[in-house]
Amino acid sequence: MSLNLAALAQAANEARGLGMDAVEKAASGHLGLPLGCAELGATLFGHAFRYNPDKPEWLNRDIFVLSAGHGSMFLYAWLHLSGYKVSLDDIKQFRQLSSTTPGHPEFRDTPGVEATTGPLGQGVGNGLGYAVACKMAQAHFNTKDHKIFDQKVVVLAGDGCLQEGVAQEASALAGHLHLDNLIIFYDSNDVTLDAMAIESQSEDTAKRYEAYGFEVVTVKEGHNIERILEAYEHAKNSTSGKPQLIILKTTIAKGITEVAGTNKGHGEAGVKFVAAARKGLGLPEEKFFVSKGTRDYFQAHKEKLQKEYASWEKLYSEWRSANPELAALLDSAKVTPDASKLFSVIPKFADAPIATRKAGSDVLQPLAKALPLFISGSADLHGSTLNYIAGAGDYTPKNTGGRNIKFGIREHAMGAMLNGFAYHGIFRPSGATFLVFSDYLRPSIRLAALSHLPVIYIFTHDSVAVGEDGPTHQPVETVSSLRLIPNLDVIRPGDHEETAGAFVAALSRTTGPTLLALCRQNLPNLSQFDVNARREGVLKGGYILQKETGALKVIVISTGSELNVAVEAAKRLGDGVRVVSMPSTYRFDQQPAEYKEEVLPSSCKKRVVIEAGVTPLWHKYVGLEGKIIGIDRFGTSAPGATVLKTLGITADAVVAAANSF
């Protein structure tokens, strides 16, 4: 399809009109980017991009991530014009309750939206994750005769995105990994929300990205479709082996003369000038107007794209016939792993005391072998988090099939990249660091939970038992604060077998992220209790580890490394004491009322909780009469056992609390 500049220019102005009308109707939203990047949208969606609006999950589609998610009407307008299932009525419901056009793009809610974005810079990390996943897919599934994967990943980012630390971490890693399938369009309009960008930035962005290892092209005429296309085609076909940054010099809110090029053009301030702007753009007074010419153009373009899809589908069918084992492996990406099958590949543990981080490593190896699409990364801590997949190789520019990813000391980029992997959907991502550093990637964890992404976090060194490193490295509030994130399953296993259950629980969950909080110090394997009961009990979040002898008098509840302390205390207390292990409050809370009553009968008011962390969240489980043994202060630097004793995380404390009723 030849380049039809007149049709694309008309479509750009009509997309501007849709943006203005939607924001005006909602009395809320951001006009700046949808108007400032309209020609970019026309170039990509109207000519250069490979997609199929009827098959939005096409495996080999080009990926578009709107990192500057506040400009969501840019994306909705182009999805509508391109023929995705985003209707004009959907556009009219922009930012309204239960609409498919929310204020910021949300994955799964809107066909064609590839990532949940809004917190600036996250989309850059997501794009990097997508790009690595695409490279890995090529390495794992392409053959000499059938190259079924060769797509590009395009990110649209603004000044705010590139100022954020997560984007800087991700960009540095993208250059290091030579991700030549990644193209970042930088909407360089020299404006931020508060003021002109020069008031908060003065670096040379082009030189910064060249230093990262990018090839950089600047398009001074950012509203010239021919120049944009030239830059995109250059980036797409470059043989430099580098990721690409295209700096697009644009005018924010172009079309609304009164606010264009100023920070007032960022939000909805220009709405009161929409009528004049519509006239200046050559649009009729009719709201939400799309001309027949634009409809016809995109229908013809859609037919062209569908021919490309049909050609690929033929290639894909031939690939499946020629490579049944690879086809089965690819199909497995859409199948939720069966917990019983996963348990069957994990060997039973010996009785020797080991840390749950080491138990995690022992569990991870057979599971990773059984699940060839499972990948594991670490923020420069594989040697401590022990989540390296033996024999799977490192992902490098020369080994793009490697399943271990070295993120470097870039926790935030790791979090955003893991989300990108999960959005991609073929590989099952996991990443590791120390639990106390989870705060460095919390925004990405939150977005994973919001987007229902099956990311697995392996966070070790989970309590004050870290010891000598002191309070900067001793998480006390961290586990509880993470439990507050909706749809995040935080599992803190108490021994080897519970660790096996935790990994299986994580891998068999596909509706959201799972966080495994593992300890540094050695723990006894509670081998006096049934192996399967411990493994499978984790799947329910909480279970009776040790049933009382005789009439029930006291319930002791515990998690993680304090579970053995609870068992020791129960032994000393004697008859009538029940020990409940609760590695996951999230899972336990989802159990039927009958099960929860069976584990924690309401008739028993005498309850004690022990966990080496802050106490407030435990009140719902002990009630007004219960006792909580925890740590409502920061830790201290000393050997781990000394710290635990000093802060009262002991069997003596549990016994004293139980006897105080």
Curated annotation (Swiss-Prot):
Provide the site residues for: Important for catalytic activity: 30, 266
The record's listing under InterPro entries reads: THDP-binding (IPR029061), Transketo_C/PFOR_II (IPR009014), Transketolase-like_C_2 (IPR055152), Transketolase-like_Pyr-bd (IPR005475), Transketolase_bac-like (IPR005478), Transketolase_BS (IPR020826), Transketolase_CS (IPR049557), Transketolase_fam (IPR033247)
Cofactor(s) annotated in UniProt: Mg(2+); Ca(2+); Mn(2+); Co(2+)
* Record-linked NCBIfam families: tktlase_bact
Name of the protein described by the UniProt record: Transketolase
Question: What task does this protein carry out?
Answer: Catalyzes the transfer of a two-carbon ketol group from a ketose donor to an aldose acceptor, via a covalent intermediate with the cofactor thiamine pyrophosphate.
Enumerate the active-site residues.
411 (proton donor)
Binding, thiamine diphosphate: 70, 118-120, 160, 189, 266, 437
Q: SUPFAM superfamilies this protein is in?
A: Thiamin diphosphate-binding fold (THDP-binding), TK C-terminal domain-like
**Name of the coding gene:** tkt
EC number, UniProt record: 2.2.1.1
What is the species of this protein? Physarum polycephalum (Slime mold)
Q: Which reactions are catalysed by this chain?
A: D-sedoheptulose 7-phosphate + D-glyceraldehyde 3-phosphate = aldehydo-D-ribose 5-phosphate + D-xylulose 5-phosphate
Q: Which CDD domains match?
A: TPP_PYR_DXS_TK_like, TPP_TK
Gene3D superfamilies recorded? 3.40.50.920, 3.40.50.970
